[in-house]
Amino acid sequence: MPKIFRSLYVQVLIAIALGILTGFLFPSLGESLKPLGDGFIKLIKMIIAPIIFATVVSGIAHMRDTKKVGRVGGKALLYFELVTTFALVIGLVIVNILGPGRGMNIDPASLDTSGISKYTDAAGEQTVADFILHIIPDTLISAFTQGDLLQVLLVAVLFGFALLRLGKVGDTILKGIDTVNQVIFVILGFVMRLAPIGAFGAMAFTIGKYGVGSLAQLGYLMITFYATCALFIFGVLGLIARMSGFSILKLIRYIKEELLLVLGTSSSESALPRLMVKLEHAGAEKSVVGLVVPSGYSFNLDGTSIYLTMAAMFIAQATNTELSLGQQLGLLGVLLLTSKGAAGVTGSGFITLAATLSAVGDVPVAGLALILGIDRFMSEARALTNFIGNAVAALVIAKSERAVDVDRLTRALNGEDLPTIEPDVHSEERGEGRELDSLRPA
């Protein structure tokens, strides 16, 4: 096999192209390939919880300083709040300027709401108090069996601080956790060999089921949303990256394989483990990456934030529901809270949108039926923006903590070959370190 075809980047790219072609030419066949994409996502989700647990525990325990843990966590949460708020505002401003829903003149009573009932029902079942209580698992084990990232994060943080209190006994347990983490990443290497198959099945299903022609009516909203995400990535995140001393374009090139995987599966979770490896490989300390990236998947969903404000205002415009400035600010205020739980709710952004519209009451919930058909096509932009946003966040926090090898980061982003990840200062005696090549298909 030619060397170029051994690259995961090329394999996934070819798989996406073949998936689009299959779904377009053979729609029925494309729909039937859905299990390929679902199976790959399930394999990834199978190992996400243990990876996050081991990485967060290791990150906290290796810091040794509880004040540093609190400082990094505080910086991350402040960054997440500021950037996601900016994303919400940008979405609100652009949808008001361009008005993709104006002129549709749709009567909410005429919409078929049968397809959105499962989302509105799920949204109605969860209050703010329920969401907070949901973070606490019924048992330590249930957090892992249910695969809830927020619950796993809570257990991991408590476990990490507990190890700090145990002293030498904690160090012994930590060595075992680090070993388990290495085993999990070997398993990840096996799973990633199936990435092209998963991307092929997911893309074939999407095109086969929904078709390209069915997007024409709501295409303006999609174009507006994709353009807004691009503006946010290259404008806002690009400026943040530049202020922190690195290029957003070089970062995107560096994580291009992971971005293609996200594009093919429409899931930013599918590349989460590889993102952490790549950031460590680029010189960011494992302890910071292990805290910032997993928490970012619950609290730093920039693409989802843009989607929520744009979708809500699109429904209002399409149904001729006039919202005053005060009502729009009220909507924004509710979204500041509900958007932070998007990854912790089954159904993600769409249920969060339903919950928000139900809570605000100014925008007809029935209008969700308008965007149900294209939500799947908008998920790619959401996932890509979320993914890039978390990559930027990790590097920004790491640089603010001086927890990154600047020279190594520069070389990595410039495309230089750095095959072996340097071990952090706390793990040199154990010979830790993962080889990036171990995650590439042979």
Curated annotation (Swiss-Prot):
Q: Which GO terms describe its biological process?
A: L-aspartate transmembrane transport
Q: Which residues form a coiled coil?
A: none
Recorded GO MF terms:
fumarate transmembrane transporter activity; malate:proton symporter activity; succinate transmembrane transporter activity
Q: Name one Pfam family in it.
A: SDF
Q: Where is the composition biased (Basic and acidic residues)?
A: 423-442
**Region Disordered: start and end of each range?**
418-442
Topological relation to the membrane, as annotated: Multi-pass membrane protein
Instruction: Provide the family line.
Output: Belongs to the dicarboxylate/amino acid:cation symporter (DAACS) (TC 2.A.23) family.
Name under which the protein is recorded:
C4-dicarboxylate transport protein
Q: Which organism is it from?
A: Deinococcus deserti (strain DSM 17065 / CIP 109153 / LMG 22923 / VCD115)
Phylogenetic lineage: Bacteria, Thermotogati, Deinococcota, Deinococci, Deinococcales
